């Protein structure tokens, strides 16, 4: 019996060890993190970024960067660098998670206490130019997050993550205002950050992310970016289906499914044809807010702040909204009853006229 117990005990212990090793091998994102404001984390440095070519990613030996004050005004500073770039980590009671820097040039130290805020409530993030906010958010949408593999053949997750970080810095430093526009600004060279990945595997990921961002920023041809410029489209009544519908063609060929804000309105897509349907009459035009239906596969974007230290960001949120207005044609039924003094109505003709 003792021998049998020892054998079974060894088997049980081996099974437990295998389970522990399997759990440890899971990517960090297998455990949900947070989209919660007011969450506290402690900062630390992670490993160095190592490209799929086996080399570190390094910054320029010296470079200049802009710093934002509390009112959004900027000053230009310079720093000696050339160091290999490391990952930024945040730790809370759920574990340790990799985040991105959204404030280039400012100190990031181990052991600082950070607090999370929604991007809309972060005073730091809101003082960035609108183009910079949009760019950072879209880079996070298509960039690396825990648990994601690189979409570019021949590259690894460090290449993908470092490319994401590079694009975030370019927007935050006002060197980029769109996926296709990289330029010098405020005396800072356009290639200050791109320098680190030029000719390296991460450059392929960098190009891929920017192409996805450009595609995402393109909206359907029947929509407008501004509510005040939204066109109105009238849904026609279908007596057979007893509903109202209209099909619109997107000549921009975004080929994206849509998520609508308006209740009671359904949308389906076939290629670049979008069919909008309502079961009820719309008595006056309604403005529909829409977004592309994208699976972000991560938590909502949070800005992590610590007084006097580098501002960080995690998660992703879609900043691209577009608008159009929908109306329905009026449709009704009428009942005409023929009457006469003598009760004989057969053969009586009516002439109905109107502008409807």
PLM regions: where:
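C-terminal segment of classical bacterial N-terminal signal peptides
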Residues: 22-31
